[in-house]
């Protein structure tokens, strides 16, 4: 347990201010008479719970539903619920103190990945340990990062196309064997077909494999349309540099692609010339005062939330 800060002690001794309690105390105090969930003999046993947190309480910066959970359990749950399609990259050439804040924001908005460009050692202070719940990757240069990211996108497109091909092949085989008679002309996706995904001579206005087993024609259309939409989103993926420079596009009018990589620079110098060169788009936040730029961590938060406002459902 960390020792209280002397300033916090003095503030409490003064009687002002009164803060609400954050987190929970030891399990024995908050769940009187209830068996511990880390006891294998307990009917409430759950391997996600951390014994030390149950003993000492949990004051971490996590949502209440994750109280007492291990770090790995929280990370796995975030993965299971699905991370958002934007990724965040930060240039770490100046050991900027804002990087930790950016990583914390990426966690809050459920970014798919966080990329640190430059030295492996980065200023974690502002992250408040949230990097533990993220997929963080290191890259020696911005060029290597962008090349790696584009290859990953190409791989995701190929995987989706293979999935569509497998669906088409499955249905084709069922039709030939007599199990799917009439199936090929029962469903037509007149808009947004995945035409390039099918083996030669095989139409893609066919249902999905899981639907074929149930005879659900609506499921055929829905599943194939979802693959088609995913491929379109991946093909529209872009690398977006966030910096206020001549020729940049105002964020207020910019439509963020669903799949994208956001590049952020350091406080002061901003993004490197190579990052700006490799970006598909350069976007800036409109400002109306005398200051040349806003804090790098704040700019990153505004940018990520702009994506959230366009693509994510509100959360309570």
Across the structure, where does each feature detected by a protein language model lie?
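Post-transcriptional modification and biogenesis factors for structured RNAs
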Residues: 1-316
């Amino acid at each position: 347990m960390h020792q209280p800060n002397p300033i916090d002690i003095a503030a409490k001794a003064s009687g002002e201010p009164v803060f609400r309690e954050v987190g929970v105390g030891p399990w024995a105090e908050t769940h009187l008479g209830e068996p511990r969930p880390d006891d294998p003999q307990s009917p409430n046993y759950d391997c996600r719970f951390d014994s030390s947190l149950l003993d000492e309480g949990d004051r971490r910066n996590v949502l209440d539903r994750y109280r007492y959970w291990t770090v790995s359990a929280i990370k796995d749950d975030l993965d299971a619920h699905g991370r958002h399609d934007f990724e965040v990259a930060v240039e770490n050439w100046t050991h900027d103190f804002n990087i930790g804040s950016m990583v914390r924001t990426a966690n809050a908005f459920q970014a798919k990945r966080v990329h640190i460009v430059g030295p492996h050692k980065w200023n974690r202070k502002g992250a408040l340990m949230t990097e533990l719940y993220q997929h963080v990757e290191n890259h020696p240069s911005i060029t290597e990062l962008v090349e790696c990211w584009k290859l990953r996108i190409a791989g995701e497109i190929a995987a989706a196309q293979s999935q569509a091909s497998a669906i088409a092949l499955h249905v084709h085989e069922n039709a030939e064997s007599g199990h799917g008679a009439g199936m090929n002309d029962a469903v037509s996706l007149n808009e947004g077909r995945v035409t390039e995904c099918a083996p030669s001579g095989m139409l893609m206005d066919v249902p999905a494999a899981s639907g074929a087993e149930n005879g659900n024609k609506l499921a055929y259309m829905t599943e194939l349309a979802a693959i088609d939409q995913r491929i379109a989103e991946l093909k529209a993926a872009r690398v977006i540099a966030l910096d206020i420079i001549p020729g940049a596009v105002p964020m207020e009018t910019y439509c963020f692609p669903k799949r994208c990589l956001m590049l952020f620079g350091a406080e002061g110098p901003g993004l490197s010339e190579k990052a700006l060169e490799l970006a598909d788009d350069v976007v800036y936040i409109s400002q109306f005062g005398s200051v040349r730029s806003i804090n790098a961590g704040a700019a990153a938060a505004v940018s990520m939330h702009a994506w959230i406002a366009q693509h994510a459902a509100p959360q309570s």
